[in-house]
């Protein structure tokens, strides 16, 4: 069954493979946001997705995605970048959320930049 306890246990057992980006690499991070039902009868654990804006020339235009974006110089970590971007994009503060961990760093395609995935 998919719930935050299952995800928490999997993340605790996971040691993510990290990529050490070069100085010119632009990093990005996303937040995978889970919400447990308030009661057992209320349903199942939910995961939040957004629909990306439609823009000509954007290969991911209009697709479903996790909230997130590029890391700025003011972001102290990739987690901070994911939190800031989530608030900017959908107005949801993750300041009081339980941080469960990071997934393996992934190379974004086709641009070849490092995309670091976070779960919050």
What are the roles of these predicted feature ranges?
Residues 1-66, 70-120:
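N-terminal leader/linker segments that precede catalytic domains of diphosphate-processing enzymes
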């Amino acid at each position: 069954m998919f719930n935050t306890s299952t995800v928490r246990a999997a993340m605790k057992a996971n040691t993510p493979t990290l990529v050490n980006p070069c100085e010119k690499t632009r990093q990005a991070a996303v937040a995978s946001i889970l919400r447990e039902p308030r009661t057992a009868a209320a349903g199942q654990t939910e995961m939040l997705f957004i629909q990306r804006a439609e823009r000509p020339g954007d290969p991911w235009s209009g697709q479903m995605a996790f909230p997130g974006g590029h890391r700025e110089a003011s972001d102290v970590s990739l987690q901070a970048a994911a939190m800031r971007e989530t608030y900017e994009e959908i107005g949801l503060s993750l300041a009081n959320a339980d941080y469960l961990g990071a997934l393996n760093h992934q190379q974004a395609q086709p641009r070849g930049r490092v995309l670091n995935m976070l779960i919050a």
